[in-house]
């Protein structure tokens, strides 16, 4: 993408900037449902993927299909026309959003790591994703502090994505508020990824584990987690990360029918997978993955000179996919 076009997109999308990480706390959500429609306000054409009521006002969760940014806004601010999911895919077929969905679906037969696993082609750097699965341990704050300290002179706020589960949010309000504070202080720019509500794990084979466990209710895992995110002032992104990176063709299809793009990883550090240029790096920040955290801190140390010379950067997952599919 040419620099002039990138600047133009950033300027035109200013209403999204600053609202895609967190917003108001919606603590009286009712009638929350999957609802697709074209939403038009002036020259702005967005895709609504959710509708809900809060304090007797109707809201929409909106997606910019070109930049993959999301925001929540009053439904009354837009002229809307409802769409069925096949029509969504047809209407926005040339957008990075639909192309990313199609790319993710192409890997839906994999039991592990289905979805997008490589973000930024031919770029020097990575897209960092940090998973917050349920845990009784405190947040590994050193990860976020290290990112800010390393990149503050090069990229501020530093972009990263957090895959957050419902059970983690319920038990770690102080840590969640601390993360939101980093965004408010303009230290980090966080993309919030849905990581399911319960994130159940058992001792069964992977084909019957995580979201593939018998009795799993995807409406609860997806929509209740989004509601909890909104209650905590987090704006859900268009991304979904499968717990354990485990899925099958059916669950991938169902997640995409919610309008969400499955995101995997080609560099799970704790498993010894080293990142390449454009990798989507995965570490756990929930206190349960000491090896992955140490490996990431060491990676930052090894890349210090490249960071200072702007030869190794953190990339926003959304912008990386926009570059990949905006062709």
At which residue positions do the language-model features occur?
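Active-site metal-binding loops of divalent metal-dependent hydrolases
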Residues: 130-134, 196
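Metal-dependent polysaccharide deacetylase catalytic core of the NodB/CE4 family, i.e.
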Residues: 152-253, 257-282
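Short acidic donor-binding/metal-coordinating loop in glycosyltransferase active sites
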Residues: 132, 242, 285
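Terminal accessory/targeting
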Residues: 1-129, 139-141, 145-161, 167-174, ...
């Amino acid at each position: 993408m040419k620099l002039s076009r990138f600047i133009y997109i950033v300027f035109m999308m200013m209403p999204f900037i600053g609202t895609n990480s967190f917003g108001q706390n919606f603590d009286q959500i009712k009638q929350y449902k999957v609802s697709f429609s074209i939403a038009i306000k002036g020259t702005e054409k967005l895709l609504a993927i959710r509708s809900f009521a809060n304090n007797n006002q109707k809201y929409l969760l909106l997606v910019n299909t070109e930049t993959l940014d999301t925001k929540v806004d009053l439904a009354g601010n837009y002229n809307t026309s409802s769409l069925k999911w096949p029509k969504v895919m047809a209407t926005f077929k040339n957008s990075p959003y639909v192309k990313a969905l199609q790319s993710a679906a192409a890997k839906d037969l994999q039991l592990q790591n289905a979805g997008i696993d490589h973000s930024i082609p031919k770029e020097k750097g990575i897209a960092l994703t940090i998973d917050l699965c349920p845990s009784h341990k405190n947040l590994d704050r050193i990860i976020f502090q290290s990112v800010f300290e390393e990149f503050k002179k090069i990229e501020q706020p530093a972009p990263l994505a957090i895959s957050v589960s419902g059970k983690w949010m319920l038990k770690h309000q102080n840590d969640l508020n601390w993360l939101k504070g980093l965004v408010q202080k303009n230290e980090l720019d966080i993309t919030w990824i849905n990581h399911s509500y319960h994130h159940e794990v058992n001792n069964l084979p992977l084909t019957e584990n995580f979201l593939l466990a018998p009795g799993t209710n995807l409406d609860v895992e997806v929509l209740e987690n989004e509601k909890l995110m909104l209650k905590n002032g987090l704006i859900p992104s268009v991304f979904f990360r499968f717990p354990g990176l485990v899925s099958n063709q059916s669950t991938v299809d169902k997640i995409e029918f919610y309008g969400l793009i499955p995101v995997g990883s080609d560099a799970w550090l704790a498993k010894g997978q080293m990142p390449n240029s454009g990798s989507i790096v995965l570490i756990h920040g929930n206190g349960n993955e000491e090896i992955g955290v140490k490996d990431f801190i060491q990676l930052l140390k090894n890349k210090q000179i490249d960071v200072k010379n702007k030869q190794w950067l953190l990339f926003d997952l959304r912008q990386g996919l926009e570059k990949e599919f905006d062709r």
